[in-house]
Amino acid sequence: MSLDFKRYLCSRINWDSSVIGIMGERGVGKTTMLLQRIKEKYANPDDTFYISLDHYWFGTHELQDLIKFMYKRGITEFYIDEVHKYKGWSTILKNLVDELQDLRIVYTGSSLLEIDNAKVDMSRRQTIYTLRGMSFREYLEYEGILKINPLAFEELLTDHVAVSMEFVPKTKILVAFDNYLHTGVYPFYKTAGKDFLVRLKEVVDTVMESDLPATEKITYDTIEKCKKLLMIIAENVPLQPNTDKLAASLGTTRDTLLKLLYKLDKAEILELLTVELKSYKKLVNPGKIYLGNTNLMYALSPGIELGTLRETFFIDQCASVGTVQMPSKGDFIVNEKYLFEVGGEDKTFDQIAGIPDSYLAIDGIETGYGARIPLWMFGLLY
């Protein structure tokens, strides 16, 4: 297990917390983070214990019994993978933390988990983090091309020219950007090689066939509808849905359709663009529906439209660090303030002329000027 490259979240976690939860999309590297932490902290790996709850061993054995058994033998820190595969996991962990002095737990789970419910049990003792797919900045480091510190959003808006001038001469940044759009979001692209897109399709299938049923009371028929829904969207991105017609085509109700859409959004397979701030507690009609990232477009969409590819990258990167909404003019509004149009080198301000805090995110350029910012630079935010 190499420590040469670590995900952005590693340095943000307060590892002193007694209970740490790391949520995230399947395939983004949660397990690798756990194993790196073990290697980094323990000279002797036998001083801690790693558990994967998707192992068949737990079909006939209890998690709490295993932890108590190892605790009595001097193990006080446990790394638990895929908690969503174990029924009643949050109550079990709460009871163990209450019962066993100085017990420490780091766990991972699907982004589909309703952690708000779990927080009722351990709200004062656990800290929850979300691991996103790799940013373009991380990809550059992972590939050994460049090492760049993350930029705050406002810093990007004001300092993008100086930042790009520092790094652009060192590499063919647009070539790297194109490679990232194809295969750079999920760290396993390195081991998957030419099979990456096939593997990514399998990841999506696993989310629908395994993770969804593990986190929701859901029938086989609903899973099949979910798959059909995803294919309809993948073939028509960005989809501007008529929810009544879309529900009818799936043979379901509008309410069920919205629940499925928001579940796929939470799983980061989709990105729902709404006029008001998105909330999983208030399911409103999305104005547009995108796939969750550009790699998913190449894996699932029969044809790639360049404008949609650009917009998908922009919304994915910006939504990782802030909020993105659908404005009345322009393409996106970020953090309820900054208005953006996304396009190629010929893009102008015509559609958003005279609007304060408006910018262009321009593809195909290495360096921008003023309010024209290179699209690739929005991949430097985390």
Which role does the model predict for each range below?
Residues M1-L3, I13, I20, Q36, ...:
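A cross-kingdom feature that marks ATP-driven nucleic-acid transaction machinery
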Residues R26-G27:
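Walker A (P-loop) phosphate-binding loop of P-loop NTPases
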Residues K30-T31:
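Conserved lysine of the Walker
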Residues P45-E77:
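Short glycine-rich substrate-engagement loop in P-loop NTPases that contacts/grips substrate
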Residues Y71-W89:
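Conserved P-loop NTPase "ATPase switch" module shared by AAA+ and STAND
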Residues S110, D116-E224, L230:
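Interdomain motor-coupling "hinge/lid" segment immediately C-terminal to the ATP-binding subdomain
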Residues F188-S328:
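Accessory nucleic acid-recognition modules appended to NTPase machines
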